[in-house]
Amino acid sequence: MGKGRAFFEGSRRLACGAELHPSFTFRSPIARILAVNKGEDPQVSSSTLQSNIALPEKREITTTPRLSDRIFRGVVTGGGLSSLVILGLILIFLAYEGYNTLKAQGIHFFTGSKWAATTGANGHVDFKASHFGIAAMLIGTLICATIAVLIGVPIAVSASIFLTFYAPQAVKKLAVTVIDLMAAFPSILFGLWGYFVLDPIGVYWAKLIHKYFNWIPIFQMPAGPYFDRSPLIAGLILAVMIIPIVTSISREIFAQTPLDRIQAAYALGGTKWAMIKNVAFPYARSGVVGGTMLALGRAMGETVAVYTVLNIVYQINWHILLGAGGNVASMILLQFGDASQEEVKALMAAGLVLFAMTLIVNSIANLIVNRSVKGRS
């Protein structure tokens, strides 16, 4: 056995607490220097080495977390559960308050478009004699949100592609900051800006659309040329409001495109646009769809901005250029101030429907995003 191999074999047995062979001699240069400094024989025998060197005590591995870890875990768990508890309490409250209305109105609550409370002989609202229907508001909610998605999502995805693959670093940093600030703007600011700035511009474009595309049913004007404060204007405002959401999500997903796939596309002679179309788009498709669904949920639940730029009318309006429409959230805001105690319960029922719609849309969006992340990992 060579000296080097004997040294390592002896060191291994020593570390394990095993007996060393009597012929083993520790010839480490460091050990010899230390022995000479102490006036000892540099050729240390195995018995002397094993008796003079204190082996480290065996370490115990414990799985019990420390107190600080347990406290932190409890705080984080409590914070996560509190959001679910609050969400559940809101759902229970809306269901409890709106139960009588839903029971009395039945399917008419979802198919009717008339909102009129009838007072009974006792001075209270008679739910059976009253007419509470949100069909017009439900359709208006879907129309405004759809317009917002059709206009806002292409702009947001294009912006995210530019910021990820084309923009210089300085421009990217500034644009990301502005987009993040837009996401934090209050809704009333968007509403006021839409009313004073976007509405006149939207009326001009609505007239052009009606002039050249009035053969399409949704662009016709059956009730006269009332272009002001139409669902198109509300959809434009909502499009501006959802652009930051879709842009941020899409930009993060495009930035996660694997570098090896990008380099492989370039190595095959592809241009940057070919790489984006054949590599980045397929990779980020599910995430972009999930971000779009989240933006759709935001657009469906928007209240103040829509209320500011849209004429609230209780009739089903499929003509997006006509200045009449509404959504569930703006209807609740409009009626809540003058509502009686019983009518408030009807508004709670409308809020329950809106809550369920946004919850379903957001759940689908989270499912799509999670599946996209798992698929990429």
Where does each model-flagged region fall?
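Glycine-rich helix-loop "coupling/hinge" segments at transmembrane-helix boundaries
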Residues: 296-341
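Periplasmic/extracellular loop-to-transmembrane helix junction in inner-membrane transport proteins
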Residues: 58-70, 74-75, 95-148, 168, ...
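C-terminal transmembrane helix and the adjacent membrane-cytosol boundary/short C-terminal tail
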Residues: 251-255, 259, 266, 334-377
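Transmembrane alpha-helices
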Residues: 178-181, 185, 189, 246-253, ...
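Hydrophobic alpha-helical transmembrane segments of multipass integral membrane proteins
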Residues: 135, 139, 143-151, 155, ...
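Transmembrane alpha-helical segments of polytopic membrane transport and secretion proteins
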Residues: 3-8, 13-16, 22-80, 365-377
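Membrane-interfacial helix termini and adjacent extracytoplasmic/periplasmic loops
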Residues: 104-135, 190-240, 320-322
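Transmembrane-helix boundary motif in ABC transporter permease subunits
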Residues: 148-179, 365-371
